[in-house]
Amino acid sequence: MLRKVFAVVSVLLVVSAAKVTKLVLDDNYVNRVVGGEVAKNGSAPYQVSLQVPGWGHNCGGSLLNDRWVLTAAHCLVGHAPGDLMVLVGTNSLKEGGELLKVDKLLYHSRYNLPRFHNDIGLVRLEQPVRFSELVQSVEYSEKAVPANATVRLTGWGHTSANGPSPTLLQSLNVVTLSNEDCNKKGGDPGYTDVGHLCTLTKTGEGACNGDSGGPLVYEGKLVGVVNFGVPCALGYPDGFARVSYYHDWVRTTMANNSK
């Protein structure tokens, strides 16, 4: 089944009511949190929402420092910096927080080569963010997270396939798989490799539309970026960019674009 589902994945460009081009992916690719609970206020102060003005929440992301947000490449392709803003400092999409302007979008030069690989990108804020109790950076991990580890997924993705999007940030603990188990349970080894991290708990728990680009955290460090899944929470693994694998790319890309 998974092999067939992945085969029909396609990228769609949709124009919002505000005539702003927004990149979305069909339901076989973008993700959200299913089976989670409302996150406590301030429990994920590194979590941001990438927003399209006039449209709203598009993807998640993680604040790495006062200027940079880590997200998925597919959240950035087709956009110019002026197309996006970054919401920080709130668990609610309806109130609180601060919307920040973006001045640079960067993603891996081999994004989607091969398909579903190198899905990682960076967003540079126009001005440094002001840190507070509700706005904090997260350290990105240099070490690979082990299999069978309990990790934390957060996001504003749909709470069921074709279901509603939550106003409040959702949180869910999930369990990592080895790449071997991920390929076995996913049904097609061509879509995951050493640059991926997979999670799976049970049917009814996982990522969904709107979670893309968001954080997966282990022992307080960022270990994954939401990439893809079978919508939604149907008992198949969810795929993430493995942050430890892309650690050097993240570090050098930020350093080379600091001015």
Curated annotation (Swiss-Prot):
GO (cellular component) term, any one: extracellular space
Which one Pfam family would you cite for this protein?
Trypsin
First-listed, main subcellular location of the protein, grouped into a coarse class: secreted
| Keywords associated with the record | Digestion, Disulfide bond, Hydrolase, Protease, Secreted, Serine protease, Signal, Zymogen
Reactions it catalyzes:
Preferential cleavage: Tyr-|-Xaa, Trp-|-Xaa, Phe-|-Xaa, Leu-|-Xaa
Disulfide bridge positions per record: C59-C75, C182-C198, C208-C232
Entry annotation: catalytic residues: H74, D119, S212
- According to its UniProt record, the EC number is 3.4.21.1
Protein family (similarity comment) = Belongs to the peptidase S1 family.
Question: What protein name does the entry list?
Answer: Chymotrypsin-1
